Amino acid sequence: MGLMAAMEQRFSMKMSLRRRQMLAALGAGPVLATSAQGQGKAVAPSGRPIRIGEINSYSTIPQFLVPYRKAWELAVEEINAAGGLLGRPVEVIARDDAGRPDDAIRHATELVTSEKVDLLAGTFLSNVGLAVADHALRTKVLFLASEPLTDALVWEKGNRYTFRLRASTFMQSAMLVGEAAKLPAKRWVTIAPNYEYGQSAVTSFKALLKAARPDVEFVAEQWPALNKLEAASTLQAVLAARPEAIFNVTFGADLARLVREGNLRGVFPRIPVVSLLSGEPEYLDVLKEETPSNWIVTGYPWDQIATPEHAKFFNAYFKRHRDYPRLGSVVGYGMMQAIAAAITRAKSVETEKLIVALRGLKFSTPFGPTEFRAIDHQSTMGAFVGRLALKDGRGQMIDIRYADGANYLPTDAEVRKRRPPEAMK
């Protein structure tokens, strides 16, 4: 059996009967091609392309960003096949920031001044996202941040030119706190990478859990450098604090090191863990049989979601790439869905008109209907919450539920306390 045939058989076996029936009923029609132009034969786009400058850490975070790129490329193909936007073809010019804010700023400058892009999009790391957001403010260029999760991006350091697609650290922490508060644990320890994302996540989780459970205390914090976690010494320090539960924010190679060492020491599953992002296939694919059981996580159970929006997306992605989507795929595709909806609503690519169009914009993503809040430019795209389990030699999420981001955002009054007034004009 060839590789592609074997993969198709594997994925088909994993999909439930209900899911396969839904896919068969919906067919393989592309999502954006249908929604962007409606019925009828599309007219080929012409004229000057609408140019999007996309900046991301492709060489640094390939497990997330290779699927991310595959998905936005698919979305662009569908848009152009359906007639483009405003009758014009869409073109994306991508640059690799290598995880460095300075490189991202250099690329942003070159994309706007030399490539004449109409807007900027992308970024993964929170410190890089903040740097590009500041550049967008200074140069008055629209920036749609697809992935960086720090709360500061839309609140303390938010600006009128920056919008964010993905659920923030506050939102995902709030999604987890409901389950965390049910644990009998009172003594908590945090483990997080020592940069903007980790710091933001720990701040949000601590505040939210203390509000839900005033009796808890955080007895220690571990701050390993990103991608440089020393698992043995980190866990030794954690155990010295005698925790009853752990809040983990590490991801990628750091997560793999932590899990391996924790399994060897018998820390997992003896000590309950609440963990951001650890249910995403980008990380479960690496952990494989080492996946720790019963962690409470946010993630993406791609083979368990039975909604029309996700089924169409899954079908189109698999048909194009002969691979299942990762969470990065959802983000990349959703980013282009948001951009397409904004340009269609604005009937223009002028920055000020796009800002007006994006505020309160309702659009579709593989996770379903989503909206950009006008007050803080944060989208309501949610995440899946569940527990980790090991099945057939691989990690997966169980007991899943979709947490709609709209239910995990602060009130307008709270936002006004944190977001600069000029950002809300």
Mark where each language-model region is:
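N-terminal secretory signal peptides
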Residues: M1-L17, A24-V31
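Signal peptide-proximal N-terminal region
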Residues: G47, K70-V92, A211-P214
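Periplasmic-binding protein-like
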Residues: L111, E115-F124, L144-S146, V189-A192, ...
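Extracellular/periplasmic periplasmic-binding protein-like sensory domains
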Residues: E261-Y333, T344-V349, M397-M424
